[in-house]
Regions:
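Short C-terminal tail/terminal secondary-structure segment
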Residues: 96-99, 150, 213, 226, ...
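A conserved structural motif in NAD(P)-dependent oxidoreductases
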Residues: 210-221
Length: 250
């Protein structure tokens, strides 16, 4: 993209979650932007679609499991075939891990976290660069976490996988810079979403107390993605943009 006003295509995985839905609304509201949204759940995708502004660009959807490369390639291919290019990939699909000390967690817990959080991001990069390299342009934004920079007890698989995503963004940034492709990641702190709805108030208060600015919302995060996807960040690659309400500051 040489001009921010040129029409662009944005692909978002994990579009059915709280952050994915907020990102979909954000990019749908930006001018000259067409979207391809993907998620594992049709019901979640339908809910995201229902919340999009009517005045936005075209939107296509496709169900996909990001741990399967063929399914991710199909999402990117849909974007390229329908809109003629892929300018931005937001690799946002991810899972939490069960709570537990390292020795108590099952092998399956580790494998599931790595397949979705790490392999899912790898598959997104693999699929996107296949289209972006011939364009000699593109921005890939991965969803990492402040948990990849700090330690959360009883959440080793999640912390380890998000640390891997941060390093993956750095390596991919170096590998694809000469192809005109930028790769960055966003490291959110804890934000209110559906997964917190059933937590008791004292648990929420304890989590909020670790964030000097308190708990955020998905709406507090979308600006970071919008920036990294835009020409305003054209000299940024390999960065981990922390948006965490000050959690990592102390």
């Amino acid at each position: 993209m040489t001009e921010q006003t040129a029409r662009r295509t944005v692909v978002i995985t994990g579009a059915g979650g709280a952050l994915g839905a907020a990102l979909s609304r954000q990019f749908a509201s930006e001018p000259a932007t067409d979207l391809v949204l993907s998620d594992l759940s049709q019901a979640s995708l339908d809910a995201t679609l229902a919340g999009l502004p009517e005045a936005g660009g075209e939107v296509a959807t496709l169900l996909a499991d990001v741990s399967e490369i063929e399914q991710v390639e199909a999402v990117v291919a849909l974007a390229n075939e329908r809109f003629g290019r892929v300018d931005v990939l937001i690799s946002n699909a991810g899972v939490l891990s069960p709570n537990g000390r390292i020795h108590n967690l099952r092998t399956e817990d580790w494998e599931h976290a790595f397949r979705v959080n790490v392999l899912g991001a790898v598959n997104g990069i693999r699929a996107a660069v296949g289209v972006m390299r011939p364009q000699h342009a593109g921005s890939i934004v991965l969803t990492a976490s402040v948990s990849g920079l700090t330690a959360w007890s009883h959440a080793a698989p999640y912390c380890a996988t998000k640390a891997a995503v941060i390093q993956l963004a750095k390596v991919a940034a170096v590998e694809y810079a000469r192809d005109g492709i930028r790769v960055n990641c966003v490291c959110p702190g804890t934000f209110l979403s559906g997964i917190h709805a059933e937590l008791p108030k004292e648990a929420l208060d304890a989590i909020a107390g670790r964030h000097p600015l308190g708990l955020g919302s998905a709406a507090d995060l979308v600006g970071a993605y919008s920036y990294l996807a835009s020409d305003a960040s054209r000299w940024s690659t390999g960065s981990a943009l922390v948006v965490d309400g000050g959690y990592a500051a102390p």
